[in-house]
A protein has these predicted regions:
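Short beta-strand->loop micro-motif that forms the acidic, two-metal-ion catalytic signature
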Residues: 47-51
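Catalytic core of pol beta-like nucleotidyltransferases
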Residues: 1-28, 37-42, 53-111
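Basic/aromatic recognition patch in beta-strand/loop cores that engages polyanionic ligands
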Residues: 34
Length: 111
């Protein structure tokens, strides 16, 4: 099982690869869940919210993000769990107000 420092290195590498691979499409990257709250165990997944643009490219960008997460997961022995949204989803009166996104807004940390 990866140590806390290995998990942090994996997360940092994931963010570097996102920035390199998505460039101008990447709007924001935020850590949430047990890792952000300081409650993670070595078996916990690492929840990451990734905001991309444009809205109509989300599916294609999500595929790339999943590939990046997979590579980092295999290399570091962690489980990064990406959740991909767009500004349109975040600002939508219904989708943006879901309990999930409300919790992410409240507890997330910028990466």
């Amino acid at each position: 099982m990866p140590s806390s420092s290995e998990r942090q290195r994996a997360l940092a590498e994931f963010v570097v690869r996102l920035r390199r691979g998505l460039a101008d499409s990447l709007v924001d990257v935020r850590l949430f869940g047990s890792e952000a709250r300081g409650e993670a165990s070595p078996e916990s997944d690492i929840d990451v919210l990734i905001v991309v643009q444009p809205d109509d490219a989300r599916i294609a960008l999500e595929d790339r993000i999943i590939d990046i997460a997979f590579d980092v997961n295999v290399e570091f022995g962690v489980y990064i769990s990406p959740r991909v949204v767009t500004p349109g989803i975040l600002n939508h009166p219904v989708w943006g107000a879901t309990p999930f996104l409300s919790n992410v807004r409240r507890e997330s940390l910028p990466l």
